């Protein structure tokens, strides 16, 4: 995972 604001 390397995304900010993906719902995680």
UniProtKB/Swiss-Prot annotation:
Top-rank taxon: Eukaryota
Annotated positions of the Arginine amide modification: 8
Entry annotated with the keyword Secreted: yes
Annotated localization: Secreted
A GO CC term attached to the entry: extracellular region
Originating organism: Tityus obscurus (Amazonian scorpion)
Tissue: Expressed by the venom gland.
UniProtKB keywords: Amidation, Secreted
Protein name per its UniProtKB record: Cryptide Pep-22
